[in-house]
Amino acid sequence: MQVFWFIPTHGDSRYLGTAEGARPLSHDYVKQVAIAADSLGYEGVLIPTGRSCEDPWVVASSLIPVTRRLKFLVAVRPGLHQPSLAARMAASFDRLSGGRLLINLVTGGDRAELEGDGVFLDHAQRYEQSAEFIRIWREILERSHEGGTLDYEGEHLSVKGAKLLFPPLQKPYPPVYFGGSSEAAHDLAAEQVDAYLTWGEPPAEVAKKIADVREKAARHGRSVKFGIRLHVIVRETEDEAWADADRLISRLKDETVVQAQAAFARMDSEGQRRMAALHAGGSRRTRAELEISPNLWAGVGLVRGGAGTALVGDAQTVADRIKEYADLGIDTFVLSGYPHLEEAYRFAELVFPLLPLSVRDRLAGGVGGPLGETVANLYSPRASQS
């Protein structure tokens, strides 16, 4: 099991949909979150993409020297990036980071944003372009280890004599992650990517997605890993966790929700449509209405695009829900919480000890200093002495 955290390059806050409790984004703050994730033992961090965010490649590059082992899940954008350039970017980053790059293939689902970026393709065409893009990208990087070149002619993208002089550290290329809920997305995932990501839907729906992608991949003689993107609200007691879930959306105004849902409705993303359906397009507001599956809460999606659900509960309950997803075949959990700095610590301290040993192994590199405040100037506390 791998647990990732999230770098909030679109801003951070204690409340959703309001400036109250907001935290200004700065490089110092981004570094704090990254250093915390690195030192706490998270496998890596997802760095978001889109016009609401700082550029993910610039941000990720700036975090290489302040982290030691943290991996960076960074987006490539067909239509915004050309595959040859994206291959050079990936190879350079991978070498300079010591092999810590992971690629997030993002097709995009907001037509207004895409058109602003110069991409005028419909849903089907975007997935065709993405399939061509990642095929070219993979081939260029794979051939770079032997000095090879690539000729490729597609419907949307073509290259002639494409060559990468300096290969990536990881062979054949940094692993490719990809998310999407449409049939076209599942086809692309099955044929070309290393790990398929889903947003946090109820376990039964996630199981259907996994089964579909797995079956499609088998037809190509491939296997695919699976990951899930979730928010987390974990506290020492169940009541505290649900109170903080309510508090997170307590400053939301009706007009803010209406405006956000109208924007989501204009998108042609199947994943976003499925997220919106979980809270009935913003009409559900109470805990009973927003708890769409045991301890799975859809309140975040009232105003946040993309991942809109959170696991809510005490540490043991949240760990149990994570294990339920793991039993379905999920091995990568990309998590976040508001505010991201404090919640990175809280989740690691409360939930990591309850997860498989492979997660805790990343914490074993301590320097032998105090673990907790020394008791009576005599000894450091241990779990057995609590």
From Swiss-Prot:
GO biological process, one term: alkanesulfonate catabolic process
CDD domains given in the database record: Alkanesulfonate_monoxygenase
One Pfam family here: Bac_luciferase
Keywords: Flavoprotein, FMN, Monooxygenase, Oxidoreductase
Swiss-Prot/TrEMBL catalytic activity: an alkanesulfonate + FMNH2 + O2 = an aldehyde + FMN + sulfite + H2O + 2 H(+)
One Gene Ontology MF term: alkanesulfonate monooxygenase activity
Enzyme class, spelled out: oxidoreductase
InterPro entries given in the database record: Alkanesulphonate_mOase_FMN-dep, Luciferase-like_dom, Luciferase-like_sf, SsuD_RutA_monooxygenase
UniProt record similarity statement: Belongs to the SsuD family.
PANTHER family xref list: ALKANESULFONATE MONOOXYGENASE, ALKANESULFONATE MONOOXYGENASE-RELATED
Functional note: Catalyzes the desulfonation of aliphatic sulfonates.
Name of protein: Alkanesulfonate monooxygenase
